[in-house]
């Protein structure tokens, strides 16, 4: 019922986004249109594809550009970058459009939509899949399912492939406990460098650039395709349970017990504490990579009286769709995060303090508690050094904070509130003895827009700057938004 209300409200808000401001002239857009091949197109304000190109999951991430460009080949991406560089035109690159930070994948300049990079090609001999950067994970899972294989990707519907991987591949997968971070399963990146050169970047061909692309976001060019390792995938068990606020203490206890006691790498959960118009509740996702779950792993959750329950044996795609995460699209929103080493009852109880900051005016607020095994940074047999995480000595667990609201007049209020909430939870964790999180890296894909790059990449920043200067001597990628090296 709460999700229906959100859908109706968010649909209403699609007409509230600001109208186009004074935009760039069409000269750059026309130059691009004249230079690219027939495989690519340029679109202007008013057209259906223009609006599809700029659409984001959070409307606060949408801006109105002078035009949108849908490149159809890597070579055309290079041509586009050349024109943008020579004219010093601000631009954005959008993959799936799930970024919440304003200006990270949107612009008032030239908006590059990677929509046409939509292939999924499975190679049974190498046990890899080539995946286009314009896809969302839903598309990938659906394409690989007939082959009985899967990749380590996003857990809920609507998440883009490109941002997920380039931001660290750690908005953890249901398969992370078994196979590691998504970035540790990347075999190759097809990258259009800022100079326009198209390169197939592997650990052997260019180890420094390969390192930088593993979590370094859009600082080194535009990735058009990823080659990922695949893994066998059969039926899974799990789904969504919702609980009302009178069972919060039981959910807290079950979550902490799971986090501390469960060692089966096939088992995973997300406990999401929701506040809809100030009313608390819990959305509980359960997952087991097999048709049935062993006794004892999820018993505590199943024993709690529920409001709704959809837990069963199903295919992997069905489980991904079980989470109603798209119900909050078309709202204004922001993520933030705290890196933790574990969860306790008192730490989870502290979540409610943060919610009270905006409980009277926030349309939707959520905190995702995501327990994983402590060896997640080293479980992959192919893991190598990466831009993120800068250290793999401890398996950090990123608590994901998400605030959603209706109108831009409240942006600063909610940005400040989510910062305060994250700071409070961090202080509680440190006070409980999690001293190793002091100075620990923040996960880029959850980080709020003004997070310093040093907080994400730590001691790797100096090396990343050297790589950036080498691959992008004219600093072309500084014309695009995002966390800048």
Predicted regions mapped to residue ranges:
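Soluble FAD-dependent oxygen oxidases
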Residues: 2-3, 9-485
């Amino acid at each position: 019922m709460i999700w229906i209300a959100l859908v109706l409200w968010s649909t209403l808000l699609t007409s509230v986004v600001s109208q186009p401001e004074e935009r760039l002239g069409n000269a750059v857009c026309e130059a691009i249109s004249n230079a690219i091949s027939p495989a690519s197109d340029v679109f202007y304000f008013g057209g259906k594809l223009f609006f599809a190109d700029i659409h984001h999951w959070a409307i606060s991430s949408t801006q109105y550009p002078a035009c949108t460009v849908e490149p159809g080949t890597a070579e055309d991406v290079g041509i586009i970058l050349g024109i943008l560089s020579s004219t010093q035109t601000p631009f954005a690159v959008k993959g799936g459009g799930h970024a919440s930070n304003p200006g990270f994948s949107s612009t008032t300049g030239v908006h590059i939509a990677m929509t046409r990079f939509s292939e999924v090609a499975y190679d049974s001999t190498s046990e890899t899949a080539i995946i286009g950067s314009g896809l969302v994970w839903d598309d990938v899972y659906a394409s690989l399912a007939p082959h009985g294989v899967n990749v380590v990707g996003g857990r809920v519907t609507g998440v883009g492939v490109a941002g997920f991987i380039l931001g660290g591949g750690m908005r953890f997968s249901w398969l992370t406990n078994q196979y590691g971070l998504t970035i540790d399963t990347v075999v190759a990146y097809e990258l259009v460098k800022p100079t326009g050169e198209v390169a197939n970047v592997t650990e052997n061909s260019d180890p420094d650039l390969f390192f930088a692309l593993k979590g370094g976001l859009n600082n080194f060019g535009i990735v058009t395709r990823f080659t990922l390792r695949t893994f066998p995938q059969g039926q899974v068990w799990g789904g969504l349970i919702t609980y009302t606020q009178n069972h919060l203490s039981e959910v807290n206890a079950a979550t902490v017990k799971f986090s501390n006691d469960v060692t089966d790498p096939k088992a995973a959960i997300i406990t999401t504490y929701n506040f809809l118009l100030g009313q608390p509740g819990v959305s509980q996702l359960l997952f087991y990579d097999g048709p049935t779950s062993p006794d004892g792993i999820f018993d505590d959750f199943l024993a709690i009286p529920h409001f709704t329950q959809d837990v069963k044996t199903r295919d992997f795609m069905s489980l991904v769709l079980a989470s109603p995460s798209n119900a909050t699209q078309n709202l204004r929103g922001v993520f933030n995060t705290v890196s933790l080493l574990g969860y306790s009852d008192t730490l989870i109880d502290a979540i409610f303090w943060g919610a009270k900051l905006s409980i009277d005016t926030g349309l939707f607020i959520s905190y995702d508690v995501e327990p994983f095994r402590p060896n997640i940074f080293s479980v992959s047999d192919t893991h190598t050094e990466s831009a993120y995480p800068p250290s793999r000595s401890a398996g950090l667990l990123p608590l994901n904070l998400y605030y959603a609201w209706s109108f831009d007049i409240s942006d600063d209020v909610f940005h400040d509130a989510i910062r305060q909430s994250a700071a409070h939870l961090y202080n509680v964790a440190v006070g409980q003895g999690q001293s190793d999180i002091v100075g620990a890296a923040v996960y880029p894909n959850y980080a709020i827009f003004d997070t310093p790059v040093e907080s994400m990449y730590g001691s790797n920043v100096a090396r990343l700057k050297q790589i950036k200067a080498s691959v992008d001597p004219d600093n072309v990628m500084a014309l695009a938004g995002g966390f800048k090296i």
